[in-house]
Amino acid sequence: TITCPKAHGELDIYDALTVSCNCAFAQLAEELGQKKLAEYAEKTGLTRPVDVDGYQTAAGSFDADQQQLGQVAWSAIGQGNDLVNPCAMLNFMGGIANHGKAVTPKLIKKITTPAGIPVYFDIMPSKQTLLNKKTADTLSEMMRNNVVNNYGQSNFGQLPICAKSGTAEVGEGAAPHAWFVGFLQDPLHPLAFVVMVENGGGGSAVAGKIANKVLQEAYNAN
């Protein structure tokens, strides 16, 4: 049985994402089916390993048994046997922010001016398209809506942030993993981010605060 912490009533897709309505996305999952969900998990890179300057990350997985009642719905909301590498999620966030184009990850310790001031650098997008532009831009709008109508813009100061929280249950009585992912809608600060706190608890309450602290430093550095 798929449940939510509270009854949300009738929702459109924007509001369903904003309040993280498990039931809404479970319903969509049942309509789409396991095959289509697995296909797009692969297409968007969420289950593929990511190559970061020659270092290959672990692959993720979307393992939903069509024959097992409720398993497709659970997998569609990131539970069940789902696994996603934070680097793959970061790649996906960059793709959304970049109108559907994946951005090649790079390992960089720091880049500064002679005075020690951090500077930004140009990032060359890879040729891989994760999403079409319309879909990516719609997701950007939805993630911006999350901040304005749920997380609260006041919690992020002047950051033009688009984000989604996640609270991943891990079972065996352990506290859930806290996730907070997204990007800044600012061409002068083209920053995507992923914060995952193992057994940290609620997503926005825990990981969101960490993301905000780091982003404030980066955003106000120049």
Regions found by a protein language model. Name each.
Residues 85-91, 206-213:
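Short amphipathic alpha-helical face segments that pack within enzyme cores
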Residues 1-195:
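Beta-lactam-recognizing serine transpeptidase/beta-lactamase-like catalytic domain environment
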